[in-house]
Amino acid sequence: MSQIKKEMLEIYKPYSNMDWMNYKLVKSDVTLHHIIKKENGGNKCISNLSLIMPNAHQYLHLIEYKDIETYNTINKIFKYVNQQGYEPTIEQREIIEYLLKQFESEHKWDKGSKGKLIIKRKYLERIYK
């Protein structure tokens, strides 16, 4: 595990056992999402990173492709989480969950280039209720 992941896990102390998008957190598998993308000048520093699982990371970039407003709103919440210095609050988790459900409602029948639905079952397996 990288030093920056260890530092983030120590700072944000995920007592909820959820990543920042409400998926079950497996510390050894967690990924770092750049809030401001590297290609847009975003640094690999704690204030520009969020802790999300690989499925969540893949899903977040699908959301970026299909609905940039939702993507930007989720990233704004991630910025607030970094400013507060602890894992997302219940209210922040509820907003993220609402945004994800809205996206799923609007795009549940969208298909990719191979004719398969773009919202995979694994994207719906969040643990926040």
Segments from the language model and where they lie:
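Short functional micro-motifs and their immediate structural scaffolds
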Residues: 24-31, 61
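Short cysteine/histidine-rich metal-coordination sites, predominantly Zn2+-binding motifs
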Residues: 35-41, 68-77
